[in-house]
């Protein structure tokens, strides 16, 4: 087993260790205090979308147990908490009246973090779009970007004086391709035009969110969390190398290019540009405002091969076989070196600010035995990937912090409650929390750290 103290010695004294969650995955209380349904509440209730028709009605009951959960973070010695805010609690219809009780909850949560000395890293959007906005087309409609701008301004005006950092969006890739092209996430669309519209409008909403945050809370560092894909070619053959570049443009460039270069990827636009929504003259300038930081979510490599099927849609790739035999319980390949290669590639291609690993973790479904959860494979996963982060720092990359996904087992989207990513086990019948062996190991690593000034430097 990797000794946490040995690993800790490889990180600079101002490196930040945190844990991450998301509103819909943990809060429950979906009808409490004026909250209205999100697209995920509706999606859970539609047959065939979520394992066992599980839903977020109770989840980890964090809405009622937040103090206990913050105490747990403090007891683990973890310095920072990355959480998301539920738009349907704060502006329940997406537009229209602000729900003070929703804001009050996050007031209590943020104040609770501050009282315990926990740094606050808030995410404005982690997929729980107010259902009412689907009446206008949801993210396929430009009006949703304007609704998000008002929501962002509302949140930052209320909480900005107590946040250590804010991200506009978590994983636009999921909210775009997984939700509008592959149909796996809410709203379950399978339509390229809808996906391209969602892509541009989410990118635009990100830009609006940056503007709104800087207008009302100029001291809070603003960033964006992206689940970049490694796009590793199956072979050195020309067809596979070209396929890997197309995959990179589609899965990464669709977001990185507009945000960090002020343009959409050329080959992608050549193939799909005539199906894009209207891109107004000022849009790319709004989208590409300089960020103070960015977050990378990484779990598993993407391996691709050329798909030579006649007429196949861009990016014309298909999955290539895994290289590692090690897989998590959700079936994802474990291959830490891809994280190093991915960060190298992204910093080669883009002028990026400092980086936080905002999610990294593994799904293993061990239960509690004699008051313990022996999840050695998860512990090994963390040790291996944190070793790569230390390598990246050694190699000169501006890695500033690491957030384990997740603090606790939770609602894992289309997989329901059957897949567990937590450092802490949750018994969903009793809501009892049990720190797993991986959580104890992570706690030993994080709590042994100096508690200096770990704020994000403003760009």
Curated annotation (Swiss-Prot):
GO terms for biological process: cellulose catabolic process. It catalyses: Hydrolysis of terminal, non-reducing beta-D-glucosyl residues with release of beta-D-glucose. Its EC number is 3.2.1.21. One of its GO terms (molecular function) is beta-glucosidase activity. InterPro entries: Glyco_hydro_1, Glyco_hydro_1_AS, Glyco_hydro_1_beta-glucosidase, Glyco_hydro_1_N_CS, Glycoside_hydrolase_SF. Belongs to the glycosyl hydrolase 1 family. This is Beta-glucosidase.
